[in-house]
Amino acid sequence: MLTALVIDDEQFAREELAELLDETGQVEVVGDASNAILGLKKINELKPDVVFLDIQMPQVTGIELLGMLDPETMPYVVFVTAYDQYAIQAFEDNAFDYLLKPVDPCRLNKTVKRLNKVISQSALTQQLSAITPDTLDQIPCIGHNRIVIMATETVECAYSDISGVHVRSTSQTASTQLTLKTLEEKTPLVRCHRQYLVSIKAISEIKLLENGLAEIITKTGFEIPVSRRYLKVLKEMLGISH
């Protein structure tokens, strides 16, 4: 059964959504919060599978809260709001879904079913990753309702966002339940940004930008950000002294 946290500044809205989730028979509401700050605390404490998050809240909005979460450990996020003008931004920020108030029970059921499907696939991939050796020649990924085994030597980069960790090869991109930390430890990929790893042999060009930042262009033309803290190490690995 999925575990869920409901964050909304209106008590009635929290109670109503909790009741609708309970009626699905597939979700256990483990807590709620009346604002984003308290919600962040409860996310870290309760570690729910999914957060149903209002957007328009005082002081800190739901979208701002989303930006505070660690992409590697954060739960799935479903925005619940009366304002449809936020829909595009929500999906750009990689929210799992977007529900309009008043929440339609049938629409909510569809969201819950999708969540169950995605989380079940994630659990299967985690079982595969649990038996991986100290070094990975292949990376188990999920793509289009199938498990994809991606050869590590073909991987250009790996990156994380709110929807998970993604592995990009010379021919495809797929999602994996392995964390960036695991990929960094068990593959030749090196850290170039908090949310990106890159294969040194895939680098075609490094553009030096302002403020000590940089951007990698891979041999297939993919652009990867490089943060200041990793640029020096990256240069050293490439034999560049300045």
Swiss-Prot record:
Residues 3-116 form the Response regulatory domain. GO terms for biological process: regulation of DNA-templated transcription. GO terms for cellular component: cytosol; protein-DNA complex. GO terms for molecular function: phosphorelay response regulator activity; transcription cis-regulatory region binding. Residues 139-240 form the HTH LytTR-type domain. It comes from Vibrio parahaemolyticus serotype O3:K6 (strain RIMD 2210633). The keyword Transcription applies. NCBIfam families: PRK11697.1. This is Uncharacterized response regulatory protein VP0538. The keyword Phosphoprotein applies. Keywords: DNA-binding, Phosphoprotein, Transcription, Transcription regulation, Two-component regulatory system.
